Amino acid sequence: LGLRSKRVGYCINVGIQLIKTGYNLRDYCQIAISRLAKISNSLAQRRKMQLVATSCRLGEGSELGPEAVIDNNRTSPKYIDIGANSYCRGRLLLYAHGGQIKIGDYCYIGIRTEIWSMQSIQIGDRVLIAHDVNIHDGTAHSPDAKQRHEHFKNILKRGHPSTWDDVPGVVAEPIVIEDDVWISFGATILRGVRIGQGSIISAGSVVTSDVPPGMVYQNKIEPHLRPIK
């Protein structure tokens, strides 16, 4: 039996003995539930620390929230580097064929935020990224339908590709988010963008070009149709 099963069994046996001696069942159940919750939280924290050790570098005072996901498809934790005193509740993902994510000190990554890299995403210090933000430095798929189909079939057969040769038509460019930037909820940051120091990205904006320092950026994409090249 595992450690958790042994502890649960121990709690049950102790409860039976206490009930036989006239101990109040309701009081014991409350105590047992509290202790089991502590055991569960302890095991969850242990699993989280094991995840950190194998998938990323976590600076002093930094934490991964219970909702955080580290999806490192590369071979080393050095490719996801989180600085000191930062808190991440979102998903950090590296593709197997490339990518790295570097997050500075005193940063916050909100719940359901997705940061996916196949090239490079660098986030400075004191950056606030709200919930439901998407940051992607690559196109993920080819604009050519046949290449997309082959890519999908290869993933099903062999898993995600490990070299750039296996993803024809895919394009990636580095993203840089400088110090003291605030990205509000629901924003999307696309490849090749640099956001200057202290700038604010308004909720729901889609950023496709550089933002100078100290600016408020607001952009809602309007419907626009053009032929596929």
Annotate each predicted stretch with a short phrase:
Residues 1-143, 150-155, 160-163, 167-180, ...:
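Domain-scale signature associated with acetyltransferase and cell-envelope carbohydrate enzymes
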Residues 133, 193, 205:
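Short beta-to-alpha loop/turn elements within the nucleotide-binding domains of ABC transporters
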Residues 184, 190, 202, 207-208:
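Short hydrophobic beta-strand segments in globular cytosolic domains
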Residues 194, 209-210:
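Conserved functional loop/turn residues at catalytic and ligand-binding sites
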Residues 218-219:
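Catalytic binding pocket for nucleotide-activated donors in carbohydrate/polymer assembly enzymes
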